[in-house]
Amino acid sequence: TLVFQPSKEILEQNFKKLCSYGILDCSIYSASFNSKEISRITFATIGSVKNHPELFTHFKNIIVDECHLVNPKEGMYKDFFDAVKCKVLGLTATPYRLSSSRDFGSMLKFITRTKPHVFSEVIYVNPIRYGLLGEAGLLFNESFRVE
């Protein structure tokens, strides 16, 4: 599995987190880390792999963190996905895109409703429901308890 991260910092954080679970068959392919290792699970930034899709055609799956940043019409991600031809799973906490039309002006569209689209279906949505205002003035969602 190839795992795309939007930045060097998030790549490092997620790589270390996976390793902390005892999964050691993972590597980093990123110019920012001076590391170009490919293993069963490879963490990468699109900028580091965009010119070398042939190295990743054996992967069956790609996971894209912050997938709302993927341009479905053109760009590095689209070119890479077209070249490697495997399943792509996108993860995001922002499943909407701002789009505009001459008739309706600016509007938010769910990521699977844009045309053309990279992501064709939504597997799971966890809506945030805001609850109580905590003592620190922070707004907690219902998964946190204010004591």
List the predicted regions and their residue ranges.
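A short beta-strand-to-loop transition that corresponds to the Sensor-1 phosphate-sensing loop
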Residues: S7, A44-S48, L91-P95
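Post-DEXD/H (motif II) to motif III coupling segment of the RecA-like Helicase ATP-binding lobe
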Residues: K60, H68-L139
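Inter-Walker segment of RecA-like/P-loop motor cores
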Residues: Q13, L18-E54
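Hydrophobic positions in the central parallel beta-sheet of the AAA+
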Residues: V3, T42-A44, I62
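Walker B catalytic carboxylates
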Residues: D65
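Conserved Walker A/P-loop ATP-binding site and its immediately adjacent core
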Residues: T1-S20, R97
